C-alpha cells in the first residue's frame, strides 16, 4: 500500500472528470480520506459520486492511499492533480 498526504490546490478549470480520466489509466484502487476534526470521510476515487461526497475544497488536507500493482504511479498522479500540478 502506498500512502501520501496532499493539500488541495485546484484551479477552477480543473474538473472531477479530468481526475477520473487520469485514474482510468491505473488498475490500482485509490482511496482519499478527508479529515474533519476527529472523524474522516473516505471515498474510492474511481467513484465519481464518492468523490463528490467528499466536498473537497482548496486548503483541505487529505490522505491518498493506493493498493494494487501500479499503486505508486496512481497515488503520485492523484497527488499531483489535486495539489495543482500538471
Locate the predicted segments by residue.
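Generic N-terminal amphipathic, Lys/Arg-enriched alpha-helix
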Residues: 1-6
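Compact, glycine-rich, soluble single-domain proteins
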Residues: 7-54
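C-terminal structural segments of small proteins and small subunits
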Residues: 57-86
Amino acid at each position: 500500500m502506498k500512502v501520501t498526504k496532499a493539500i488541495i490546490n485546484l484551479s477552477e478549470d480543473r474538473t472531477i472528470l479530468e481526475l477520473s480520466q487520469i485514474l482510468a489509466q491505473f488498475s490500482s484502487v485509490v482511496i482519499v480520506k478527508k479529515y474533519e476534526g476527529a472523524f474522516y470521510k473516505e471515498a474510492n476515487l474511481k467513484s465519481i459520486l464518492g468523490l463528490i461526497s467528499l466536498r473537497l475544497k482548496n486548503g483541505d488536507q487529505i490522505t491518498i492511499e493506493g493498493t494494487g500493482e501500479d499503486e505508486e504511479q496512481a497515488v503520485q498522479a492523484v497527488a499531483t492533480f489535486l495539489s495543482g500540478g500538471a
